[in-house]
Amino acid sequence: MAKNRHLFTSESVSDGHPDKIADQISDAILDAIISKDPDARVACETTVTTGLVLVAGEITTSVYVDIPKIVRDTIKEIGYTRAKYGFDAETCAVLTAIDEQSPDIAQGVDEALESRSGKEIDAAIEAIGAGDQGLMFGFATDETEELMPLPIFLAHGLARKLTELRKTNKLDYLRPDAKTQVTVEYDEFNQPVRIDTIVVSTQHHPDITQEQIAKDLHTYLFPEVIDASFLDEDTKYFINPTGRFVIGGPLGDAGLTGRKIIVDTYGGYARHGGGAFSGKDPTKVDRSGAYAARYVAKNIVAAGLAKKVEVQVAYAIGVARPVSISIDTYGTSDYSEQELIDGVNELFDLRPAGIIHMLDLRRPIYRQTAAFGHFGRSDLDLPWERTDKAEALKKLIVK
């Protein structure tokens, strides 16, 4: 590797990975509830293991949803439909342990500190406080059209295409569990120049050879996802490097909601506040705050105000207004952090109810985000991925 160059690696997983099964179940339950009760409070956690799904959490709603049916339908859609896979949508046990949201938390969400203290400016917006304290990050970079880091973008692309090859029976020996990983080499100007390493581990039928899998992935997977200009004779490929991946899914590993937070975001390229997304209604700023931060970051880069930017927002439980906003452009902007923050504060409402209204989050849009990443999804119409405020932001800041 040339002097002053460096490598960066990100990974993704398929929708059949145990942790992603759990995420998708949690978000499918959330979608089912808020489609009938948009104001419901949902904090839904799922764990999956051999032959068993446990759904637990705190849900406050006036509607009924058939949780066991949602669980089975989700597992079936993912592809675990045969007992020989070690996990079967029809025969697995489904247990539920659901409580209501704590009244101590509810009182701060139902009526924010600003509202309770008589300091509200906009009663409807100030009325909802943050559902918890915490810090969230949003990130954007101009190294891809989707304004995402290249390593995670390619890792997601491989995982998504691999799933497509399985579900369309193009490669009918594939089974649901899979992981992908991409290592990108960056030059001295921090621009991606080549792919150094690709790792794919995919569950498969016991009778298929590893040689056949490798041949098929080089034919049907890699050319469909990765621009050939990034590949060279030194690019390394590791395909099922253990030599066998028959036992997978919940039979191989237990899965839990919220255990793939780096896969869900930027692949480690940006910092993470620690809060997971799936199973949480939009009053939970772990989710809505991170979406809003991405929305802000993406519009900053789309406006040409920076080439790369990380936005942090932080909240106190029961308080509507963020306790802090910070913006780091890594030296790629001609504008000060304060100029950017002033523009963001004028154009983006980062109070929980403001975010919910701005991004129209009280809708059943979450199940589709629970695999292959929440950001950079050109295959989905996600409100936090829009750049509709870029021009207005540019006019505010560029004098």
From Swiss-Prot:
Organism from which the protein derives: Listeria monocytogenes serotype 4a (strain HCC23)
Binding site for Mg(2+): 19
Domain of life: Bacteria
Record function comment: Catalyzes the formation of S-adenosylmethionine (AdoMet) from methionine and ATP. The overall synthetic reaction is composed of two sequential steps, AdoMet formation and the subsequent tripolyphosphate hydrolysis which occurs prior to release of AdoMet from the enzyme.
Entry binding sites for ATP: 17, 177-179, 244-245, 253, 259-260, 276, 280
Alphabetized NCBIfam families for the sequence: metK (TIGR01034)
Binding site for L-methionine: 58, 101, 253, 284
Family statement drawn from the similarity comment of this UniProt entry: Belongs to the AdoMet synthase family.
Pfam families attached to this UniProt entry: S-AdoMet_synt_C, S-AdoMet_synt_M, S-AdoMet_synt_N
GO biological process entries: one-carbon metabolic process; S-adenosylmethionine biosynthetic process
Cofactor note: Binds 2 divalent ions per subunit.
GO MF annotation terms: ATP binding; magnesium ion binding; methionine adenosyltransferase activity
Protein name, as recorded: S-adenosylmethionine synthase
Chain positions recorded as K(+) binding sites: 45
Matching HAMAP family: S_AdoMet_synth1
Signal peptide: none
Quaternary assembly: Homotetramer; dimer of dimers.
Catalytic activity entry: L-methionine + ATP + H2O = S-adenosyl-L-methionine + phosphate + diphosphate
GO cellular component: cytoplasm
Pathway where it operates: Amino-acid biosynthesis; S-adenosyl-L-methionine biosynthesis; S-adenosyl-L-methionine from L-methionine: step 1/1
Subcellular location: Cytoplasm
CDD domains per UniProt: S-AdoMet_synt (cd18079)
